[in-house]
């Protein structure tokens, strides 16, 4: 039997360490609360309301990202132009900016001292301490994930198919809806899930813009600060299970796509 190279054992050790580093805290978190504690958390109106609010606002952010991000993702996938790299860098900014800073920045333009804030206020839209503010924040942090995934899907569709469709008299919109969209939908759905998963776990920006109404991460923080680790764990487990469900769907979609290609 051939002796394993030392480099093999180094890579195996690093992989084992990283897997344990990620899994052990999650396993400890999920197994720590008792079933009665989890059931009490599920029946708790505050917990149910915060989780529903997190799911609703994250889903709304994903829908907004889909509506406004899809045309931009398609444009970036099909066109090379001066300033494209700069635009892509702007899209990536929400990923690298500290999220409390995101909340402060959004409040800066939504306040009465800014002309945009005055217009928003005159329209009867309230950002600070509102569901609208939460959705605005979650859209900001989740949008890059959707755009990148959708762009990758559009790039995988051959432009020749679109040219054939156009040569047969189809309009650009008809070509997109009948050719590009059906072929790129899987990446778009992956982007929606990634955007939702990122949004549902957001804490730093949300707590600046809207401590109330409480999303699940904010409720977890409040219970940890007020009552300690044990009281916050059941809520954290429920949120982790939702995120794992989204991750499971994401893995199924990506594996199916890999199998098709």
Where are these regions (language model features)?
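Surface loop/turn motifs at the tips and blade-to-blade linkers of beta-strand repeat domains
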Residues: 41-42
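A broad detector of short, well-ordered amphipathic alpha-helices
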Residues: 162-163, 218, 230, 234
């Amino acid at each position: 039997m051939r002796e394993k190279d030392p480099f093999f054992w180094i890579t195996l050790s690093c992989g084992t360490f990283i897997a344990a580093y990620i899994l052990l805290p999650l396993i400890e978190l999920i197994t720590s609360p008792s079933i009665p504690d989890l059931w009490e958390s599920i029946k708790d109106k505050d917990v149910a309301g915060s989780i529903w609010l997190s799911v609703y606002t994250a889903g709304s952010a994903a829908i907004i990202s889909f509506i406004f991000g899809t045309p931009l993702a398609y444009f970036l996938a099909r066109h090379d132009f001066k300033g494209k790299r700069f635009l892509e860098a702007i899209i990536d900014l929400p990923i690298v900016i500290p999220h409390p800073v995101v909340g402060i920045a959004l409040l800066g333009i939504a306040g009465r001292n800014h002309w945009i804030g005055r217009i928003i206020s005159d329209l009867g839209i309230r950002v600070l301490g509102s569901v609208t503010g939460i959705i605005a924040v979650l859209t900001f942090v989740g949008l890059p994930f959707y755009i990148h995934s959708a762009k990758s899907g559009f790039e995988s569709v051959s432009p020749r198919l679109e040219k054939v469709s156009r040569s047969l008299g189809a309009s650009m919109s008809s070509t997109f809806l009948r050719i590009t969209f059906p072929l790129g939908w899987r990446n778009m759905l992956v982007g929606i899930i990634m955007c939702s998963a990122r949004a549902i776990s957001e804490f730093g920006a949300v707590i600046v813009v809207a401590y109330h109404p409480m999303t699940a991460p904010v409720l977890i923080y409040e219970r940890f600060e007020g009552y300690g680790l044990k009281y916050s764990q059941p809520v954290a487990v429920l949120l982790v299970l939702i995120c794992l469900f989204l991750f499971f769907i994401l893995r199924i979609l990506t594996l199916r796509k890999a199998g098709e290609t």
